[in-house]
C-alpha cells in the first residue's frame, strides 16, 4: 500500500479530520503500524497497547484498523471499548503498556473523527515523536512487519481501575448525599462511567443524552451546546449540572441560576481549595491566552499568580512542568491537576467541583458569586477552508492594521486574540473589554476583515 501523501498529520490534538476524506481506515492502519514500530521499539514481545474509542459510527472501523496496524507491529492490543480519553491516558500510565491511543474527535461533529496517542507515562506525544511517526508513514512501503504478530483482546473491565482511582480518594473525604446533579453526556464517551461514579458517590443523578447511537455525538448537546442542560437544571431544581464533550476530557458546569461556570471559574474555585490545603505550590495557576482578565485580577487579589500559555492542553501542560504548577487548564473546560491525573479529565474535574460544593455546604451559585466578575468577552469563529491562509493569517496586512487600531483604542481596558484553530478549519476572533459596546464593535470589524481577506 502506498504511503499517505499528506504526512503532516498531527495537529494540536492528534490526527483529526472528516472520515472518508482526510481520515480513512487505510490511513489508520498505516498510523497504527508506524506508531507501533516507533513506540514499541524497546517493547517486550506482546507488550500491550491501550485502545479506546468514543461512540461515533466510524470509531469501530478506525479502532479495528489501528489495532491491525499495532498487532502487525508486534504489540498486543487491549481494547477498552467506549470510554473517556482520560481513561486511556490513565491505563497507559498504570499498566505495562508501551502506549495508548484514543479514537475520537472530541467536540467535533459526528462526521469527523480523530486519533490521539499517549506515551507510556500517559501524556500526549511530544512533537518530536509525532515527527518520527510521520517519517515512518512517509516510508510506509519500505516498513517491514515485526515478524511477531500481536493479538487483540477486549478488556472493558479495566475501566474499573480508572473509576476507582478518581473516586476512592474523594469518597474518603465526602459523599454527595443530598446533591442533585444533571449530567449532559453528549451521546459520547462518558455515558457509561460518569453516571455510575456520581451515583456511587451518593448523588441523585439525572442524565441527558446518555443513549449514544453513533449519529448524534455533540449534536445540540454537551459542552458546546449548554441550553438543554440549563433547562434541565431549572426543571429538576438541581444543585449543579455538568456538560461533557464527546470524549469527556473537558467539562463545563451550570449553577442553579442557569449561569455557565467555565474553566476559568473552575480553576479559581479548585485553586482556592488547593491553596487552603497548602497543596498549590507558589499559588500558581497556568491558564491560556483565552482566560478572562477578571479571573486573572481576582486570582492576584487571592495572593496567587496566573501564567498564560498558548491555547491547547499540551501547551498548558508544558508551562506547568516548566514552572512547577499543580493546576492549569483552559476556559473551555480542559483542566489539569497532576496530583490526581496525568491528563485533562472532565469526569475527575466534575467530581472535584462537586466535592468543593459539598465541603463548603453551599450551592455552586454562592461560590461563583464570591469569586470574580468576568470582563465582557466575545468569541466568534470564521470558517476559512484554505489551509495556507489559515496558517499564515498573520501575513494579512489589512487584518493586522485593524488589530493594531483596536489594540490602541482599547488600551489597558481590553485585549484582542486572533488565532487559527488547530483542530477545525476556523479562524477564531476573541475580543475582551470592560465595555460591551467596545467588544461588539471591534468583534464585528475583525470578523468582517477575516471574511473579506481570508475566507
From Swiss-Prot:
Entry coiled-coil feature ranges: none
KW DNA-binding (keyword) present: no
Ligand binding (Mg(2+)): 106, 245, 247, 249
E.C. numbers: 5.4.2.10
Top-level taxon: Bacteria
Cofactor: Mg(2+)
Post-translational modification: Activated by phosphorylation.
Active site as annotated: 106
GO cellular component, one term: cytosol
Modified residues (Phosphoserine): 106
GO biological process terms on file: carbohydrate metabolic process; peptidoglycan biosynthetic process; UDP-N-acetylglucosamine biosynthetic process
Any matching Pfam family: PGM_PMM_I
Key words, A-Z: Isomerase, Magnesium, Metal-binding, Phosphoprotein
InterPro entries in the record: A-D-PHexomutase_a/b/a-I, A-D-PHexomutase_a/b/a-I/II/III, A-D-PHexomutase_a/b/a-II, A-D-PHexomutase_a/b/a-III, A-D-PHexomutase_C, A-D-PHexomutase_C_sf, A-D-PHexomutase_CS, Alpha-D-phosphohexomutase_SF
Cofactor binding note: Binds 1 Mg(2+) ion per subunit.
Single GO MF annotation: phosphoglucosamine mutase activity
Reaction(s) this enzyme catalyzes, per UniProt: alpha-D-glucosamine 1-phosphate = D-glucosamine 6-phosphate
NCBIfam families xref list: glmM
PANTHER family in alphabetical order: PHOSPHOGLUCOMUTASE (ALPHA-D-GLUCOSE-1,6-BISPHOSPHATE-DEPENDENT), PHOSPHOHEXOSE MUTASE
Protein family membership: Belongs to the phosphohexose mutase family.
Function: Catalyzes the conversion of glucosamine-6-phosphate to glucosamine-1-phosphate.
Name used for this protein in its record: Phosphoglucosamine mutase
Organism: Acaryochloris marina (strain MBIC 11017)
Amino acid at each position: 500500500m502506498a504511503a499517505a501523501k499528506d504526512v503532516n498529520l498531527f495537529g494540536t490534538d492528534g490526527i483529526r479530520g472528516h472520515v472518508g476524506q482526510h481520515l480513512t481506515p487505510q490511513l489508520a492502519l498505516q498510523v497504527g503500524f508506524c506508531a507501533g514500530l516507533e513506540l514499541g521499539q524497546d517493547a517486550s514481545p506482546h507488550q500491550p497497547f491501550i485502545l479506546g474509542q468514543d461512540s461515533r459510527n466510524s470509531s469501530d472501523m478506525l479502532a479495528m484498523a489501528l489495532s491491525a496496524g499495532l498487532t502487525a507491529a508486534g504489540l498486543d492490543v487491549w481494547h477498552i471499548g467506549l470510554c473517556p480519553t482520560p481513561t486511556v491516558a490513565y491505563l497507559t500510565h498504570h499498566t505495562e503498556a508501551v502506549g495508548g491511543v484514543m479514537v475520537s474527535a472530541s467536540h467535533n461533529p459526528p462526521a469527523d473523527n480523530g486519533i490521539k496517542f499517549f506515551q507510556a507515562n500517559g501524556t500526549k506525544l511530544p512533537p518530536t515523536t509525532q515527527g518520527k511517526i510521520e517519517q515512518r508513514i512517509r516510508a510506509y512501503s519500505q516498513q517491514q512487519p515485526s515478524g511477531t504478530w500481536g493479538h487483540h483482546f477486549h478488556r472493558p473491565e479495566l475501566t474499573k481501575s480508572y473509576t476507582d482511582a478518581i473516586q476512592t480518594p474523594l469518597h474518603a473525604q465526602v459523599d454527595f448525599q443530598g446533591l442533585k446533579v444533571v449530567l449532559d453526556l453528549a451521546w459520547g464517551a462518558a455515558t457509561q462511567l460518569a453516571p455510575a461514579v456520581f451515583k456511587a458517590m451518593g448523588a441523585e443523578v439525572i442524565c441527558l443524552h446518555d443513549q449514544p447511537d453513533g449519529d448524534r455525538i455533540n449534536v445540540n448537546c454537551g459542552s458546546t451546546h449548554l441550553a438543554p442542560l440549563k433547562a434541565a437544571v431549572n426543571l429538576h431544581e438541581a444543585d449543579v449540572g455538568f456538560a461533557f464533550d464527546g470524549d469527556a476530557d473537558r467539562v463545563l458546569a451550570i449553577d442553579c441560576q442557569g449561569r455557565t461556570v467555565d474553566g476559568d471559574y473552575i480553576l479559581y474555585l479548585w485553586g482556592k481549595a488547593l491553596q487552603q490545603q497548602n497543596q498549590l505550590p507558589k499559588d500558581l495557576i497556568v491558564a491560556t491566552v483565552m482566560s478572562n482578565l477578571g479571573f486573572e485580577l481576582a486570582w492576584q487579589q487571592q495572593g496567587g499568580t496566573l501564567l498564560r500559555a498558548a491555547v491547547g492542553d499540551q501547551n498548558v501542560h508544558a508551562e506547568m512542568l516548566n514552572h512547577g504548577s499543580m493546576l492549569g487548564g483552559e476556559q473551555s473546560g480542559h483542566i489539569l491537576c497532576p496530583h490526581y491525573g496525568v491528563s485533562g479529565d472532565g469526569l475527575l474535574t466534575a467530581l472535584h467541583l462537586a466535592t468543593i460544593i459539598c465541603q463548603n455546604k453551599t450551592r455552586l451559585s454562592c461560590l461563583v458569586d464570591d469569586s470574580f466578575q468576568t470582563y465582557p468577552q466575545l468569541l466568534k469563529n470564521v470558517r476559512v477552508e484554505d489551509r495556507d491562509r489559515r496558517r499564515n493569517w498573520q501575513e494579512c496586512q489589512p487584518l493586522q492594521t485593524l488589530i493594531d487600531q483596536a489594540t490602541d483604542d482599547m488600551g489597558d481596558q481590553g485585549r484582542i486574540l486572533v488565532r487559527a484553530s488547530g483542530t477545525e478549519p476556523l479562524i477564531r476572533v476573541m475580543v475582551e473589554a470592560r465595555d460591551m459596546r467596545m467588544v461588539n464593535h471591534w468583534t464585528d470589524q475583525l470578523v468582517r476583515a477575516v471574511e473579506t481577506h481570508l475566507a
